[in-house]
Amino acid sequence: MKKLKLHGFNNLTKSLSFCIYDICYAKTAEERDGYIAYIDELYNANRLTEILSETCSIIGANILNIARQDYEPQGASVTILVSEEPVDPKLIDQTEHPGPLPETVVAHLDKSHICVHTYPESHPEGGLCTFRADIEVSTCGVISPLKALNYLIHQLESDIVTIDYRVRGFTRDVNGMKHFIDHEINSIQNFMSEDMKSLYDMVDVNVYQENIFHTKMLLKEFDLKHYMFHTKPEDLTETERQEITAALWKEMREIYYGRNISAV
């Protein structure tokens, strides 16, 4: 896409929101409580603040304010307000490709924010536990928050990811013509690295005329030992392993497809 010469500030709002899910099997009530305590500490407010602060560094944003809170009995939230940085538009990379991991990308932001909320969850029946992190990066300026996507998914390793990206509003060029998007995008997947794409099965649901893009990701490889909390698969009977595998896989598919699936 040809670079636009704008009249005034770029007024487009670009919002990236995604949920990541971590699934676990905990056999006893004590193990379920232990998993919730473990994941709650792993993604506490301080660590989430570090991740979001690095995200600001990646997109070149100035941090104005940080609000963070750990909740009882579990959960945490962090919201960071960020401001614009003066930047030469010639330095902005508008091409459709994966963003960096720790490297810095210049951004031009205004009235923007980055926030995350966590939701640990378990049920006494079935032994299944889930952890969801809900993240939103919203910017107003010349760069898409998709540049932070690669880093965030690498930091928050997950079994399932659902991603939404939307461009809202319009900006005007020097001739007064309105532009409702200022960069090319065919798929959110184009902003992911090849190693990440190789790990997940992915599907897109895009509404191009509305500048709405959606991608769902489900981890390809399933190894039972990675889903057990304080229990080794070899300590279980073959029947138990099969039943737990079926329960975990059903749980993951239900979350991925967003609907309950009847037992076969």
UniProtKB/Swiss-Prot annotation:
Catalytic reaction list: S-adenosyl-L-methionine + H(+) = S-adenosyl 3-(methylsulfanyl)propylamine + CO2
BP term (GO), one: spermidine biosynthetic process
Cofactor note: Binds 1 pyruvoyl group covalently per subunit.
Residues with the Pyruvic acid (Ser) modification: S112
Site (Cleavage (non-hydrolytic)) location in chain: K111, S112
Cytoplasm among keywords: no
Active site, per annotation: S112 (schiff-base intermediate with substrate), H117 (proton acceptor), C140 (proton donor)
GO cellular component, one term: cytosol
EC number(s) stated in the UniProt entry for this protein: 4.1.1.50
Top-rank EC class of the record's enzyme: lyase
Stored Pfam families: AdoMet_dc
Keyword annotations of the record: Autocatalytic cleavage, Decarboxylase, Lyase, Polyamine biosynthesis, Pyruvate, S-adenosyl-L-methionine, Schiff base, Spermidine biosynthesis, Zymogen
Post-translational modification summary for this protein: Is synthesized initially as an inactive proenzyme. Formation of the active enzyme involves a self-maturation process in which the active site pyruvoyl group is generated from an internal serine residue via an autocatalytic post-translational modification. Two non-identical subunits are generated from the proenzyme in this reaction, and the pyruvate is formed at the N-terminus of the alpha chain, which is derived from the carboxyl end of the proenzyme.
Molecular function (Gene Ontology), one example: adenosylmethionine decarboxylase activity
Chain segments annotated as transmembrane: none
Entry-linked InterPro entries: AdoMetDC_fam_prok, S-AdoMet_deCO2ase_bac, S-AdoMet_deCO2ase_core
Cofactor: pyruvate
Keyword field contains Nucleotidyltransferase: no
Gene3D superfamilies the record matches: S-adenosylmethionine decarboxylase
Record-stated family: Belongs to the prokaryotic AdoMetDC family. Type 2 subfamily.
Subunit structure: Heterooctamer of four alpha and four beta chains arranged as a tetramer of alpha/beta heterodimers.
Summary of the function given for this chain in its UniProt record: Catalyzes the decarboxylation of S-adenosylmethionine to S-adenosylmethioninamine (dcAdoMet), the propylamine donor required for the synthesis of the polyamines spermine and spermidine from the diamine putrescine.
Name by which UniProt lists this protein: S-adenosylmethionine decarboxylase proenzyme
